[in-house]
Design a protein with these regions (language model features):
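A generic structural motif
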Residues: 17-18, 40-54, 96-106, 195-199, ...
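Substrate-binding groove of N-acetylhexosamine-processing glycoside hydrolases
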Residues: 21, 43, 113, 228-231, ...
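Acidic, contiguous N-terminal accessory segments
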Residues: 6, 16-78, 90, 111-113
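Short, solvent-exposed loop/turn elements at domain surfaces
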Residues: 57-58, 134-138, 317-318
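Residues in well-ordered beta-strands of folded domains
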Residues: 50, 62, 128-130, 245, ...
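Feature activates predominantly on carbohydrate-active enzymes
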Residues: 28, 66-243, 268-272, 351-358
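Sec-dependent N-terminal signal peptides
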Residues: 3-12
Length: 622
């Protein structure tokens, strides 16, 4: 008996802990169900659920009158996702954290008596919130507007996601920790693993770093600072994993041996607390050692406790033949890296649905290739059996909720990795959308029109190391060959532009119209270069460009007025926060700043990188 008792108490204790966790989760889920019922205008307690542990993730919809009981069986870590899979089968949709689509009771009853299996494509699936950019999540997670963060955490759970991380910064650090506590507590209760994104020695964009720059470069006190700041973070925040930059910036490396040492120390320190380290593996170039090779792939030599986040940028993916970003031909080397390391350590693929830096939602351009490329990458990686899919996002306004939602939906194997999963659920005309996707893929991506209709940033204009391969406006102005080539390509694309008037969602339709108007605007800007500075012909061409801009502005005004879901975050305003930027993430989109800048540059023939520049380069660096 004395040998049995310890095992009895051990089992009882573990069982009691699991029961308490379930009771806590049950209360939170009931609260969320009440919130969903209220929004749907259903009677209270129309929805209920029961849970039992099992090896297969299933949910059975049992109905009694107008009441629905979701009978959930699953492995423990999929209980929340399996439950919300039941709501999905009833017809509840959550395209955006502040947008719920509810079924009628009659439609929901079509699921009665049926059993559905939840089949996730990846064990871990979720989003990195890039709060180094001045988006809604800066206010929500880091600056105390907790309702924004709580809505987002619920959106993750409702869309069957189970990982999230947030970039933390140096300014007002204590306030950030306080602001993170409530949403991180809710995420934990819902079974969502929570991470913090930071740098070992990252200097750019106010990022929090574990080692001060001097110590990182000199090696003096680097390990002491590293351990001290890991402890500081652990003492102030309950989190599950850390994602770490290993260079001083995305484009500049630190000493290779030191960097390996920092990774190994960090992984070991985190492991003591039951936490996990992942390192970001960028696609930037020109960081190569004869001994160690590509600095971005250096973590392959670290302890196997160090996980990987292989990154791709913008609307390019692992299987694209051409990905002219950061001096690359494509990202085939990143796919090879994944395949070589997959059996050795944890890997979460780390792509994007919004780049933000003058390229997509802040232009604004609604780039539908994000739907195509993310679906293709997920489908390609599923047979590789990688552990996770971790999508980088810079915000969901200006229609970019569509791309994040499609990624979340495609974590469900039943969706078959379709680029149209979200649009189908929205009841859109799929034939029309296929023509839109095919058109943008051909012209914007394959024929590289994106380099013409997006905008050069400060780095593009002051150096030859371009973010995206492009001709700057100065180069177009100085070369008639370049100018006429770009004019010809724009005219060809405009001639084949599909009619988007049949798009049902107003926000998406307006953004597609704005995107098409940008083609016309870019064309007129280039046509104006054919004529002398003060000629009437140039003035007429620039007037035409202005006219297209004003047409776009009319549509943007409707979007900012009727489809602004975070008014307190002031995303469309000129304002500051703890990031390196002096404006909300969508101020340039709301004002069409970049469009006006191009017109003014031609009018004045002023191509100075700092002309009408809104980014403080020193703030970005320091």
């Amino acid at each position: 008996m004395k040998f049995i008792l310890p095992f009895f108490f051990l089992f009882s204790s573990a069982f009691a802990t699991e029961v308490r966790r379930w009771e806590g989760l049950e209360a939170i889920l009931n609260e969320d169900f009440q919130r969903i019922e209220k929004h749907a205008k259903w009677a209270p307690r129309t929805l209920s659920f029961e849970y039992a542990r099992a090896e297969e993730n299933t949910v059975t919809i049992n109905c009694e009158g107008l009441n629905f009981k979701l009978q959930v069986t699953s492995v423990p870590h999929e209980k929340t996702s399996t439950l919300y899979h039941g709501l999905f089968q009833l017809g509840f949709l959550f395209p955006h954290p502040r947008w719920q689509i509810s079924p009628s009771l009659d439609k929901a009853q079509l699921a009665c008596g049926k059993t559905f299996t939840w089949r996730p494509a990846f064990p871990y699936r979720g989003f990195h919130l890039h709060t180094l950019h001045p988006n809604e999540w800066v206010q929500g997670f880091l600056e105390g507007q907790t309702d924004i963060a709580m809505d987002y955490v619920r959106w993750l759970a409702r869309n069957r996601q189970n990982i999230v991380d947030v970039s933390i910064m140096r300014p007002k650090w204590e306030g950030q920790m306080a602001s993170l506590k409530a949403p991180f507590a809710l995420a934990k209760a819902l079974g969502i693993s929570r991470g913090v994104s930071l740098g070992a020695a990252l200097q750019q964009q106010n990022s929090f770093r574990l080692i001060p720059l001097f110590s990182a470069v000199s090696g003096i006190g680097d390990e002491k600072h590293l351990r001290k700041n890991i402890k500081k973070l652990n003492d102030n925040l309950d989190y599950d994993f850390m994602t770490m930059e290993i260079g001083t910036s995305e484009f500049t490396s630190t000493d290779y041996e030191k960097s390996l040492n920092w990774m190994n120390i960090t992984a070991a320190e985190l492991s003591k607390e039951g936490k996990k380290l992942f390192t970001k593996n960028h696609v930037s170039t020109n960081q190569v050692s004869k001994k160690w090779g590509n600095f971005n792939l250096l973590p392959r030599y670290a302890s196997q406790d160090v996980g990987l986040l292989p990154h791709t940028v913008m609307f390019y993916g692992l299987y694209d033949e051409n990905a002219p970003m950061y001096g690359n031909k494509n990202f085939a080397h990143m796919l090879k890296f994944i395949q070589e390391e997959n059996d050795k350590r944890d890997i979460w693929y780390y792509p994007e649905t919004s780049y933000w830096v003058f390229m997509d939602q802040d232009a604004p351009l609604l780039l539908t290739d994000y739907l195509k490329v993310r679906a293709k990458d997920m489908e390609g990686l599923y047979p590789e059996k990688i552990e996770g899919h971790f999508n980088f996002t810079s915000g969901q306004e200006m229609g970019y909720w569509l791309f994040d939602w499609n990624v979340a939906l495609n974590a469900d194997l039943d969706m078959e990795f379709s680029p149209l999963s979200a649009l189908k659920l929205l009841g859109e005309d799929l034939n029309l959308w296929e023509s839109i996707l095919d058109y943008q893929n051909e012209h914007f991506k394959e024929k590289s029109l994106i380099s013409i209709i997006s905008f050069s940033n400060l780095q593009d204009e002051i150096s030859k190391h371009r973010i995206h391969h492009r001709n700057t406006l100065k180069e177009v102005f100085r070369s008639s060959l370049i100018r006429e080539d770009e004019i010809q390509r724009l005219e060809a694309a405009i001639a084949q532009s599909p009619d988007v008037s049949g798009v049902k969602n107003e926000e998406l339709r307006l953004l597609l119209e704005v995107t098409n108007l940008r083609l016309h605007h870019a064309l007129e800007v280039r046509k104006s270069m054919r004529f002398k500075k003060k000629s009437s012909d140039r003035a007429l061409a620039l007037k035409a460009a202005e006219s297209f801009r004003m047409e776009a502005q009319t549509r943007v005004n409707v979007i900012t007025k009727s489809h602004s879901r975070y008014p307190t975050a002031r995303l469309f305003d000129w304002r500051s926060d703890i990031t390196s930027y002096s404006f909300g993430s969508l101020w340039t989109a709301a004002t069409l700043h970049h469009w006006k800048r191009e017109e003014r540059m031609i009018t004045r023939e002023n191509f100075n990188p700092f002309f009408d520049n809104i980014v403080n380069f020193m703030d970005i660096i320091f």
